[in-house]
Amino acid sequence: SNLSEINQYYEKNIPDADAWLDETETALENMKTILSDIRTQCTYGASDQLKAEDRKTILTQLESLRKQIYSEGNSDYAGRTVFTGYRTNCKLTFMEDESNTEYNIQQKFSYEDIGEHRYYDGQVELKTAEEMSQKVTTSDTKQYTYDRIRLAYGDIGSLKDKDGNEIAVGKTGTLSYHYTDNTGAAKTGDLNVTVYETEDDWKKAVKAGNMPKDGAAFIKSTGELVLGNKASETLKQNKASIELNYDKKGFNSGEVRPEYYFNCTDITDAKNKITYEKYDANGNEIYQDIDYIIAVNQTLTVNTNASDVF
């Protein structure tokens, strides 16, 4: 019996584990090369000598490279995908456009996810050299600088308030954020959020003076939570966390599937909803380690989860 176990380790488990790790390493090396290519393109795109057509070509190349990165996430060993945890029979990304697929997603953020972004208004895009040679009348270009939190997706169907109710476009609802005070006590604060359909709609509100310093704006088309200056400062000072609960219908080919990153529910079929848990009730990640027994009382974890790579 002991000899048969040793043979199993030597002839089957160890070669399988080695092949799985080798496939993962190959995919990661490919991604490293692609990221290097992306950096090269970005550096080249910063040149002042480039024309508009050149930059559009670079943008097309960057979009292609982005797709290549996520296609590596679908790498498999013997037909089993290596970055998808226990769901080795499933792809990491959507393989085709799925306009009717709908998810409810709970995406958690910390204060460290807040980043500064500049928004511009009154821009004019000159498409050709002929247009550039002509006199073009423009409105004054304005710049707005705000901190923001970006969702994993754009084209959001609806954002939920702290009670799980949809915040309608043009309306203001309340989200909750959580932090620990100086005594170690858990605290909860409120953040008022107004929902806008597009970035242009939000810019109109900003120009009208309707962007409160202690509030936020949510832009559905881009999936951005834009923070007022005071609101951002409060979240940072308290080292707060915030969870955004939203629905999204329609996913493009190449987009990552939400279940590998977030707690979410596939609500495409209202009568047969499918719930996925990435984190437990305490916010701890639920790991899906695939272990091979390679010797007596020795196991080796062979898989890497997509959320640790992408």
Predicted feature locations:
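Extended, beta-strand-rich, solvent-exposed assembly scaffolds of outer structural proteins
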Residues: T141-N252, R257
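Short flexible/disordered coil segments
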Residues: Y44-D54, Q107-D121, G154-G170, Y179, ...
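Short secondary-structure capping/junction motifs at helix and strand boundaries
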Residues: A52-R55, Q68-F83, Q107-A129, F251-V256
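Polar, glycine-rich mid-to-C-terminal structural blocks
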Residues: T101-R148, N165
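Polar, low-complexity export/assembly segments characteristic of proteins
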Residues: S1, E96-H117, A217-F310
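Amphipathic alpha-helical polymerization modules
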Residues: S1-D97
